[in-house]
């Protein structure tokens, strides 16, 4: 793969840059309830040297009834300052699956105007499988200011998505499994209808990944979007269950040079909750 410190870097790249003074590594592990894993416990047991733990559920808008929505700017700045992550840093984000929740935090940094951030391809599983060094000690943290400039074009709310679905001027791409998209399988969150946003396309995020949890090559990514019926000439809204795996689609779009994309932050956790919003099945 070609390393790009603004999107995706390999474990080899990270190993070569570990001594870079302005490198900041973030463990952004987050798991679905049925995975039966505790990200903070796993981080405390072992993480890449110097990694900080990013709590996706806590660094969010906890006033919202929806899960892990984008946090208020002041909260994000405060948490990053306390973690010692700020201006001038090259950030590398990883997770304990391979390439899963790390993409959400990559997108969140970019939403906040921080472009020097990349996902570690293959994540912690690949790092460990290669016998690279890990530790169980907390990092030494020093406050660092972060200048935030919110890129509002990178996120969409329910009203904007409803308008896009009606006007058909954006592609809406859903990262959930085909069974959930078609409404053949119930949603894991209680109280949600089954199905998908009218006119949306389905591209399960797993189709963008290799079996080892690394992202497929750009040519294969482009082919996957086209096979799903996505018109890459249009701007794209990515969606999923709660705004996590949608960011994998956004990362893939960025890798193929598609710059006009946004995440529907509320995703199906929001759309599936409101009876006045139309739902398609099949």
Pin down the residues of each PLM region.
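Cytosolic catalytic domains that perform sulfur/thiol-centered chemistry
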Residues: 1-282
């Amino acid at each position: 793969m070609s390393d790009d410190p603004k999107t995706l870097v390999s474990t080899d790249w990270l190993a070569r840059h570990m001594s870079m003074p302005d490198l900041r590594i973030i463990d952004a592990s987050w798991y679905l309830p049925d995975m039966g894993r505790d990200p903070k416990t796993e981080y405390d047991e072992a993480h890449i040297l110097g990694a900080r733990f990013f709590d996706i559920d806590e660094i969010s808008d906890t006033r919202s009834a929806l899960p892990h929505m984008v946090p208020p700017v002041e909260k994000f700045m405060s948490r990053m300052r306390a973690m010692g992550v700020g201006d001038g840093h090259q950030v590398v984000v990883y997770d304990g699956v391979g390439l899963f929740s790390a993409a959400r935090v990559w997108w969140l940094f970019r939403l906040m105007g921080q472009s020097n951030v990349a996902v570690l391809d293959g994540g912690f599983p690949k790092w460990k499988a290669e016998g690279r060094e890990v530790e169980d000690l907390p990092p030494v943290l020093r406050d660092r200011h972060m200048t935030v400039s919110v890129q509002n074009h990178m996120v969409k709310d329910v009203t904007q998505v409803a308008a896009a679905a009606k006007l058909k001027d954006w592609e809406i791409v859903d990262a959930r499994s085909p069974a959930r998209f078609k409404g053949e399988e119930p949603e894991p969150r209680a109280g949600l209808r089954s199905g998908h946003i009218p006119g949306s396309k389905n591209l399960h995020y797993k189709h963008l990944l290799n079996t080892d949890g690394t992202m497929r090559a750009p040519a294969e990514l482009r082919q996957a979007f086209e096979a799903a019926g996505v018109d890459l000439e249009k701007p794209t809204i990515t969606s999923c269950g709660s705004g996590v795996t949608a960011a994998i689609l956004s990362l893939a779009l960025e890798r193929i040079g598609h710059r006009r994309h946004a995440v529907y932050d509320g995703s199906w956790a929001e759309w599936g909750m409101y009876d006045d919003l139309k739902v398609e099945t099949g």
